[in-house]
Structures are given as structure tokens and as C-alpha cells.
């Protein structure tokens, strides 16, 4: 009888959720308070749930204020949610709990789930390329899985990579953005660990820039932090989706000197991707599962990649005090690479660099022979990469008495790379490197790199209010350990068909081991005064074993102030608030660090073989006074919102000084010493960041948002400590240099200046330009009309320079004198007028254009069907026949410095045209 009464008391409650403009909110969470009964709204914002009279329904949606309604006799209800204050967004501030954005004195670029899902990017650097308004992300090649040069606020160090620290659900992951120490010599293409971080499981990305914002993150965070939060499900009925994408890939031929290069190497490719996802849960636990399979045969006759991904996220309220969060992902990726850039085996470099002659004037019969040769070489190139990656995070959140919350995080990232280069006799014969009939010159190189990172973190957050003061206190300790083990085995003198090093008559092996641990203790105090002024004081004591026993722990402080003027009651009640909705001032100072490489401070010897016996020689001279370089950043900012925050302006001025900068100047030959890294430099970066986000149209069925950003950076080496200029990249005749008074990695070479009478003055070691473009930014447009969405995103840069080395090679080979004065051609070495091969690296690139349409619930089976089309890299505008992004110079050492600035012998990122259809259940 009790069950019968309960069944009669329950009824079916329906309704819808809209915003204050009448727009349906799809995916809003509806929960009966005090129960595990919940659901989510469909695409039209509608819901249906079982409940009883007197119960309280609660509707919530990210970015909106939660609303509650008590169920009465009616069977249908409408929730109208109001947007939450834009400055109430919660930012994860280190290893602790989140803090409302309005309380922070620093800036963070945020990419949400909706923006991530609609972009077709395969790699996280591609995803962020035009969506982070204050970052420069430049893909170095169009080959699969290759690295990007990532920078914010200028180049900070001449000793390390500019790649930010990557954190996934509180766990540090491998962020190697260069070739491994023992990696294959493909000519300059570098495989990136960022390429195999799964995209489809990401809920949110926070790009945290240097200075005070990164102080709490510890070792090597001076270049910023990319913090990834993965999906873990939402309370409500289970939601399932199946999505398929199919598209075409074509080579970008905008920058080719010869159209015949594309004829020989480019061929349209096909891509396929299949995705499956499921999420749901109750107030007690939620889950999210996703799987994907991606395959493409790229835009040329060699490259191919297959990527498989499984991801799982989970939350569980174990009791009213303890909450558990977990995430796991597994990625398997296979790819093939082609030779490129700085190797004689590169077909692309051979064609574009004039190594095969002037293709435009070549006879058809000769060209047919070249086509056959290129095809034969392509079929015999065998460079394979296989990645297996497992990442796991576990987090326990425990509510202690007195408003204290404890957070414990533990997890790991394990990444294995197998890289194999098989150079056959047949390929060398096609190349012309060995005579026809040679059968004993094949070689095989196989690298296995295992990188293991363990992270543990324990912190406590306390929140309190006393009269008109609010306090958020975070204190904790962190430990992470990284182990990088590489083993390279090589065989030479073999026959074709050999796939085991054991079958080669000559075998060699080498290894590389890098292990270091980092210990950190950190704290942050955020004090709110009358809920309008917030003062931050924090710091971290950081110690890294890579720095050696002679280096003590570092203290990295931060202080900050934010003042939300518009939160005063007098401002809210004034007439100006109808136009100027929000005003926030902020200022901060913070320090971050970059450690020197392992064993850099030690005096070492190298053990070699001489006449079959062991022999010792001097190696690293050693520097017992070596310490970490410190980046000190001061920042001032202003944020304005107009017309109920429909127009938002943000401006930031920053100045960062790298103290005790790590430089490795060249020792004079007379000293008899090898080069030694030293704390002798100082680097200065200053500039400003401007951004505007405008909601131009806000109607029931129409919405138009436009965003534009502009960034200015001035980079200069302010001190060399008396050392002579030294080279950090590029080539002998024209390189990337470090010199006092110049930007870091500036271009230097011999410059020819006309005297007006047919003669020229040649000036060695002249400044040719800056590899870093000082002006850059992004643009985006997003328009929705009812169920239709259209978006465009792009980025730009101006003011830097690039060397067209392919042009220089063509000129050296006598096939291209474009723009070179007749008085110079043939009268002196081209290395005496390299300024004629140096050009502006300005560009405007549209990265993505996309359109999608949601049909909603058109059948009883599907809650929504979405179809879409996207194009990547569809339009480019540059100052010449060179791609300002790509660089064939590579990165000389593992995690080393790279300035870019050399267009040479590698393909640009391809164009893709993708159609998609998504079924939601």
C-alpha cells in the first residue's frame, strides 16, 4: 500500500530552461533537491522529470545563476536563468582550489568545452593557435605530430625551450617539444609530445601566462602553464553521442617557388575520424567516457597517421565530507615522416632549394625522369614513429571542520616513443648516394624513449569571513619526479629487408638517462576587503635535484592587488553603470624560474675508445656557482565592461626581467676550454596585451560575438656579463645570435649596402632583424541564428624577419637571382649579401571556418542530430613566397632554445575540409 501511495504521489513534471533573452539552454542540469533524481535539458531546452508536489527543482547551467522552483499543482515550469557576473568565473590557481576570477590580480586565457568541441584540431597547440589572444603558437612543419614554437610575453631564456608546463587534472605530463636527445636525424622535423594529448576529453583549458600567475607552479613555469581539466560527467540521465568526420587534406602550395614541387610530392589525402561518448550520473556520482579513432594519409605520398584514444572521467561523493575525482586516458599513435630541410635526403628541399635545377624551365622529358626518381625515393623512405601514452589522475577532496578543505592529488604520465629510421640500399641508389648494384650499405636506427612523470600534491584551503573581510588561504606541498630513458641501437652495412639490428654486421648502441625530482612548498593568501578590493600574497619554496647539490632551494614570491570599482553600491546605483557596467584594476609582481640542465654545474669527463682501449677526455668544465635563472615580472591591468558587459575591454602592461640568465658563450680557442653554461646574462621583455570581446547582436534567435586582440612585445638582451656574442641556432653564414642590445636570437650576417656607383660596402656581423615578431594577435567571429552556428578564427603578426634559405640555396646553385642586383651576381660570394635573402615575416592567417546546424529532436531515437563543415588553414596572406611559421633549422638540443626565423625545406601545415555528423541519444 505504501508503494501504491508513493506511485500516486509522483507525477511527471515538464518544462524548459531559457536565458533572460529567451534563448533555450541545452544541457542545463535539472535536479530534485535532496535526491539523486536528475536530468538534463535537450537541445530545445526542454526537460521531463518525475517528482512530487512540494519538492524543489533546481536548474543550473555553467555561466548562469542557479534557480530553484517549488513544485505545485502545475505540471509545467519555466526556468529563466540570468547570466552570472563575467568576473565570477572560477580559475584554478595552482595546485589548490579555485578562486573567483574577480579576486585575482593576474590574467588567464580560457577555452571552454563548447569552443573546443567545434574545432577540428588534432593537437593541443593547433587548438590554441588562434583561440588564445596573447600567445604566439607557430607550427614548424606540416608533417604529422610535429612541434610548434610556443611563446607568451617574449623569449625569456636562451637555455631552454619556451614550451609551457602542461598539467592535466593536476598532473604534470611530458611536454617535450623538440626531438629527443637520441632522436632520428630527419633534417629538422621534431616530434612533439603535445601531439598525443587527447583533445576530445577536454572540458576546459586555462592558459596561464608567466610572472605572478605561475609562481605557485614551480620548476620551469616561467614560460607559462597550460592547465587542462577533463570531462567527468554531469548529473542527470545518461547522454550518448556517436560522431563521424570525413574530409580531405591538401598540401598548401601558396609558398612554393615551383608548382612542379606540388606535382611531385603533394597528393590529396583522405581523413576519417570516429568518436563515441557517454556521460551522466547522479548527485552522488558522475562519469564520462570517450573513445576515438582517427586516420589520414596526409597530403603527400609518404605521411600517414593513425591515432586511437580512450578516456574516462569519474566523480563520486563517498560521503558528505569526502569526494573522489579520477581521470584516465590511453593514446596510441602511429605516424610516418619524410626527410626534410637540412639533409641531402630531403626531396622537398631538393626541389625548392634548386638542388634538381630550375623546375620551371626543365624539359618535360627531364621532368618525367625527376618525377619517377622522386616517386621511387618516396616509396623507399621508411621513418616510423609509434607512441603509447597513459595518463592517470586521482584526487580526493575532504571537508574538514572550520571551513577547511583538504585536496590530495596523485597521478602519473607514462609515454613511450619508438622511432625507427630504415635507410635501404635501394633508397640510397635512387638518391644517387651509392652506385647501382650496391647491396651492403643499408642502415637501421631504432630509438626507444620512455618518459615517466609522477606527481603528488597535498594542499589545504580555508575560507573565512570576518565582518567586511573575506579570506581564502591555500597552503600545500608538491612533489614530482621525471625519468627520461632513451636507448638507441643502430646497425650498418646491411642488406635490404633487414628489420632487426641483429642482422647487421656492424652494431652500435648509445643511451641517455635524465632523472630529476622537484620539491615545492607553496602558499597563497587572498584577502577581500568589502568584497571589492582583494590583496594576494603568496610564494613557493622550490628545489630541483637537476640543479646539483651546490644549489639551494629557491623562494619565489608573489603579491597582487585587484580592485573591482564597479562592485561598489554607489557605482551600481549611478547612471554611468547603465553604460559602463564593470571596472576592474589589477597589479601584481611575481617570480618564476628555469633550472639549468642536469649536471651542468659538475666537472665531467668523457670516456671514449682509443686504439681499442679506454680513453678519458675533458668534457663539461663545471661551474660550482651555477644557479637557476629567475624571471621577475611586474604587471598592471585594466578591465572594462560596457552595456551590461556586452562589450569587454582588457588591457595589460607587463615588464619581465630574467635575472642571472643562463648563457653558454663560446670560449676562445686559446683557453683550451669547452663551453660552459653560466649565470652572466639579463633579458628584458616588456609590452602590453589588449583584447576586446563584443556581443554585437543579442536577440532571441540571433547572436553575434566578435573578439580581437593585439599584443606588443619588446625583447632585448640587456646584459651579456662581458661575454662575446654567441650563436644559438641557424647556420654558419647567417645565424640566430645572442648579443647585448639585441633581441634574443636575432638574425646576424654580412650585409651589402649600395654605394650608388655600382659598388657595394660589405658589413660583417650586421643586424638583419628579429626572429620574434613584436606585434601579434588573434581575431574571431561567432554567429548563431536559431539552430545554425557559423564561426571564423585567425591570427596575425607583424614586425619580425625571416630568412628564406631555400631562395639562398637556389641562388647559390645559379637558378634564381630574383631581386639580386646584377652588380652583385657572380662578383662575390652570396654569403656577403645575405640581407637580400632576409624578409618581413608578417602574416594574416585564417585558421578555421566552420558552420554547424542542430536539428534537435526530430525522431524518438535521437535527442539531437548535428551536421557540420569546417575548413582549416583556408586563407593566408603573407609578404612573399615563404611561410613565416615553418622553420627547417630545428632545435639543436633536447628541450633547447629555438627562435625560428628560417624558412627552409619543409612543408607548411595542410588545408583540411571536414564534414561531420553527430547523433545524440
Regions flagged by a language model, labelled:
Residues 246, 261, 271-280, 284-292, ...:
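Flexible loop and strand-edge segments within Gram-negative outer membrane beta-barrel domains
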Residues 29-46, 91-119, 145-149, 177-188, ...:
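N-terminal periplasmic "start-of-domain" segments of outer-membrane beta-barrel proteins
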Residues 50, 126-175, 180, 203-204, ...:
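Extracytoplasmic beta-strand/coil segments of soluble accessory domains associated
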Residues 16-33, 56-64, 72-117, 125:
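Short, acidic, small-residue-rich periplasmic hinge/interaction motif at the N-terminus
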Residues 168, 260-275, 286-290, 294, ...:
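Outer-membrane beta-barrel transmembrane strand signature
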Residues 612-617, 657-680, 707, 714-771, ...:
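Surface-exposed, extracytoplasmic segments of Gram-negative outer-membrane nutrient-acquisition systems
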Residues 255-279, 424, 435-534, 621, ...:
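Outer-membrane beta-barrel transmembrane domain signature of Gram-negative proteins
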Residues 47-50, 171-209:
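Short acidic/polar hinge/loop motifs at secondary-structure boundaries
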Amino acid at each position: 500500500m505504501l508503494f501504491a501511495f508513493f506511485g500516486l504521489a509522483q507525477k511527471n513534471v515538464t518544462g524548459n530552461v531559457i536565458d533572460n533573452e529567451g534563448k533555450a539552454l541545452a544541457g542545463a542540469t535539472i535536479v530534485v533537491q535532496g535526491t539523486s533524481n536528475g536530468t538534463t535539458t535537450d537541445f530545445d531546452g526542454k526537460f521531463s522529470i518525475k517528482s512530487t508536489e512540494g519538492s524543489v527543482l533546481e536548474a543550473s547551467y555553467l555561466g548562469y545563476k542557479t534557480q530553484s522552483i517549488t513544485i505545485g499543482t502545475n505540471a509545467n515550469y519555466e526556468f529563466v536563468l540570468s547570466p552570472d557576473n563575467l568576473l565570477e568565473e572560477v580559475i584554478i590557481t595552482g595546485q589548490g582550489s579555485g578562486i573567483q576570477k574577480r579576486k585575482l590580480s593576474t590574467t588567464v586565457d580560457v577555452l571552454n568545452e563548447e569552443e573546443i568541441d567545434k574545432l577540428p584540431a588534432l593537437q593541443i597547440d593547433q587548438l590554441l593557435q588562434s583561440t588564445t589572444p596573447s600567445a604566439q603558437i607557430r607550427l614548424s612543419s606540416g608533417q604529422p605530430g610535429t612541434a610548434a614554437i610556443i611563446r607568451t610575453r617574449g623569449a625569456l631564456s636562451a637555455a631552454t625551450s619556451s614550451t609551457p608546463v602542461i598539467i592535466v587534472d593536476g598532473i604534470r605530463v611530458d611536454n617535450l617539444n623538440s626531438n629527443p636527445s637520441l632522436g632520428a636525424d630527419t633534417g629538422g622535423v621534431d616530434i612533439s609530445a603535445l601531439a598525443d594529448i587527447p583533445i576530445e576529453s577536454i572540458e576546459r583549458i586555462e592558459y596561464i601566462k608567466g610572472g605572478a600567475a605561475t609562481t605557485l607552479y614551480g620548476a620551469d613555469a616561467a614560460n607559462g602553464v597550460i592547465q587542462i581539466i577533463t570531462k567527468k560527467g554531469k548529473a542527470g540521465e545518461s547522454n550518448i553521442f556517436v560522431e563521424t568526420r570525413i574530409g580531405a587534406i591538401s598540401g598548401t602550395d601558396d609558398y612554393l617557388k615551383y608548382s612542379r614541387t606540388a606535382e611531385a610530392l603533394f597528393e590529396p589525402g583522405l581523413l576519417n575520424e570516429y568518436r563515441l561518448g557517454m556521460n551522466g550520473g547522479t548527485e552522488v556520482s558522475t562519469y564520462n567516457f570517450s573513445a576515438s579513432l582517427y586516420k589520414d594519409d596526409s597530403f603527400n605520398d609518404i605521411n600517414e597517421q593513425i591515432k586511437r584514444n580512450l578516456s574516462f572521467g569519474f566523480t563520486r561523493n563517498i560521503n558528505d565530507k569526502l569526494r573522489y575525482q579520477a581521470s584516465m586516458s590511453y593514446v596510441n599513435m602511429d605516424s610516418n615522416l619524410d626527410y626534410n630541410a637540412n639533409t641531402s635526403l630531403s626531396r622537398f628541399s631538393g626541389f625548392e632549394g634548386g638542388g634538381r635545377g630550375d623546375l620551371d624551365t626543365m624539359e618535360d622529358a627531364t621532368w618525367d625522369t625527376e618525377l619517377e626518381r622522386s616517386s621511387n625515393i618516396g616509396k623507399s623512405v621508411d621513418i616510423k614513429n609509434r607512441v603509447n601514452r597513459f595518463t592517470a589522475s586521482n584526487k580526493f577532496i575532504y571537508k574538514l571542520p572550520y571551513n577547511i578543505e583538504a585536496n590530495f592529488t596523485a597521478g602519473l604520465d607514462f609515454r613511450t616513443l619508438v622511432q625507427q629510421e630504415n635507410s635501404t640500399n635501394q633508397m640510397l641508389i635512387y638518391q644517387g648516394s651509392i652506385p647501382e648494384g650496391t647491396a651492403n650499405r643499408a642502415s637501421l636506427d631504432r630509438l626507444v624513449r620512455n618518459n615517466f612523470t609522477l606527481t603528488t600534491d597535498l594542499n589545504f584551503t580555508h575560507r573565512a569571513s570576518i565582518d567586511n573581510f573575506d579570506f581564502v588561504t591555500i597552503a600545500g606541498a608538491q612533489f614530482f619526479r621525471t625519468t627520461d630513458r632513451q636507448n638507441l641501437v643502430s646497425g650498418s652495412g646491411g642488406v635490404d629487408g633487414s628489420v632487426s639490428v641483429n642482422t647487421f654486421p656492424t652494431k652500435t648502441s648509445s643511451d641517455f638517462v635524465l632523472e630529476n625530482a622537484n620539491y615545492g612548498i607553496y602558499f597563497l593568501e587572498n584577502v577581500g576587503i568589502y568584497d571589492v578590493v582583494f590583496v594576494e600574497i603568496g610564494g613557493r619554496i622550490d628545489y630541483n635535484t637537476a640543479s646539483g647539490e651546490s644549489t639551494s632551494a629557491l623562494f619565489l614570491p608573489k603579491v597582487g592587488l585587484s580592485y573591482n570599482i564597479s562592485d561598489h553600491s554607489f557605482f551600481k546605483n549611478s547612471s554611468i553603470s547603465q553604460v559602463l557596467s564593470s571596472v576592474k584594476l589589477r597589479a601584481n609582481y611575481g617570480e618564476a624560474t628555469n633550472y639549468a640542465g642536469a649536471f651542468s654545474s659538475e666537472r665531467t669527463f668523457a670516456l671514449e675508445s682509443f686504439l681499442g682501449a679506454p680513453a678519458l677526455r675533458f668534457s663539461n668544465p663545471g661551474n660550482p656557482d651555477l644557479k637557476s635563472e629567475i624571471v621577475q615580472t611586474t604587471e598592471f591591468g585594466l578591465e572594462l565592461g560596457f552595456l551590461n558587459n556586452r562589450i569587454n575591454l582588457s588591457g595589460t602592461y607587463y615588464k619581465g626581467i630574467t635575472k642571472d640568465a643562463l648563457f653558454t658563450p663560446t670560449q676562445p680557442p686559446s683557453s683550451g676550454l669547452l663551453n660552459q653554461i653560466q649565470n652572466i646574462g639579463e633579458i628584458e621583455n616588456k609590452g602590453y596585451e589588449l583584447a576586446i570581446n563584443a556581443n554585437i547582436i543579442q536577440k532571441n534567435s540571433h547572436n553575434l560575438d566578435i573578439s580581437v586582440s593585439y599584443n606588443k612585445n619588446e625583447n632585448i638582451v640587456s646584459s651579456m656579463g662581458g661575454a662575446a656574442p654567441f650563436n644559438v641556432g641557424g647556420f654558419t653564414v647567417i645565424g640566430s645570435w645572442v648579443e647585448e642590445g639585441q633581441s634574443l636570437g636575432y638574425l646576424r650576417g654580412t650585409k651589402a649596402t649600395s654605394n650608388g656607383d655600382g659598388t657595394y660596402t660589405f658589413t660583417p656581423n650586421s643586424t638583419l632583424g628579429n626572429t620574434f615578431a613584436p606585434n601579434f594577435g588573434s581575431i574571431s567571429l561567432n554567429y548563431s541564428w536559431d539552430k545554425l552556428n557559423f564561426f571564423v578564427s585567425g591570427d596575425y603578426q607583424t614586425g619580425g624577419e625571416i630568412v628564406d634559405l631555400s631562395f639562398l640555396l637556389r641562388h647559390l646553385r645559379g637558378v634564381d637571382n630574383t631581386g639580386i642586383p646584377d652588380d652583385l651576381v657572380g662578383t662575390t660570394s652570396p654569403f656577403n649579401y645575405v640581407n637580400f635573402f632576409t624578409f618581413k615575416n608578417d602574416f594574416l592567417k585564417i585558421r578555421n571556418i566552420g558552420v554547424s546546424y542542430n536539428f534537435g529532436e526530430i525522431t524518438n531515437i535521437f535527442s539531437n542530430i548535428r551536421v557540420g563543415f569546417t575548413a582549416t588553414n583556408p586563407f593566408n596572406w603573407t609578404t612573399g613566397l615563404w611561410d613565416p611559421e615553418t622553420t627547417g633549422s630545428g632545435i639543436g638540443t633536447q628541450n633547447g632554445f629555438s627562435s625560428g626565423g628560417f624558412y627552409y625545406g619543409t612543408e607548411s601545415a595542410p588545408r583540411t575540409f571536414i564534414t561531420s555528423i553527430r547523433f545524440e541519444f
